[in-house]
């Protein structure tokens, strides 16, 4: 009886990439901004506390600081302070994560469109795109450009809709539990390169130590089952 080979796998319809901590090493700059604000308020900035803010949009982080930590500022001023500090840190320079540009260029060579899906504000994303190369992305979705931010699925749903593809056919790339929750809730498959604990492998989730370990053409998880 002849052996029938399995059907050829299909590449993802799109690559939907988080920015901070995933493509560029800015997650620590964001957490440094949060830590500086906490210390100014006389509060502890332990690793456990800071992990709660990893991947969080500025407005969500500000609300959390005011409501859960009792900082002596209102939400609007807290958000402005965090945004100003984080933006200054990013403007001073960012480092691209190992393998990030190779992953994006490989996707482009394979005809897979890429979108940037970030909880950062538009002006921060634009700064980072100068380093990453805006030409590598078909579109970007930033904070406030979807009805709800991460961990809700809206940013990923918006990116998939903008590219005209089904989220279930997309591969999302994330580094935090907040972003991972958003991607999975949108129905995407997930490639996680964790910057903080909390993401575990699963039926739709692969976890790698570095994007340098990934080649879309050879990576089984990147293809729908």
Language model features: what each stretch is:
Residues 62, 118, 183:
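Residue-level signal for inorganic ion chemistry
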């Amino acid at each position: 009886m002849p052996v029938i080979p399995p059907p050829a796998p299909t590449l993802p319809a799109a690559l939907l990439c988080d920015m901070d901590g995933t493509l560029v090493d800015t997650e620590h700059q964001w957490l440094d901004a949060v830590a500086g604000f906490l210390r100014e308020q006389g509060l502890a900035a332990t690793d456990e506390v800071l992990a709660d803010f990893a991947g969080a949009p500025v407005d969500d982080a500000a609300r959390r600081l005011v409501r859960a930590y009792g900082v002596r500022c209102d939400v609007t001023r807290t958000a402005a302070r965090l945004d100003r500090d984080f933006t200054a840190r990013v403007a001073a320079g960012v480092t691209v994560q190992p393998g990030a540009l190779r992953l994006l260029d490989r996707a482009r060579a394979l005809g897979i469109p890429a979108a940037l899906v970030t909880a950062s504000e538009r002006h921060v994303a634009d700064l980072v795109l100068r380093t990453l190369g805006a030409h590598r992305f078909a579109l970007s979705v930033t904070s406030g450009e979807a009805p709800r931010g991460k961990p809700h699925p809206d940013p990923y749903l918006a990116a998939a809709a903008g590219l005209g593809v089904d989220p279930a056919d997309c591969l999302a790339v994330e580094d935090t539990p907040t972003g991972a929750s958003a991607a999975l809730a949108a129905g995407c498959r997930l490639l996680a390169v964790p910057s903080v604990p909390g993401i575990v492998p699963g039926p739709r989730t692969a976890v790698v130590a570095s994007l340098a370990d990934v080649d879309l053409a050879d990576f089984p998880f990147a293809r729908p089952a």
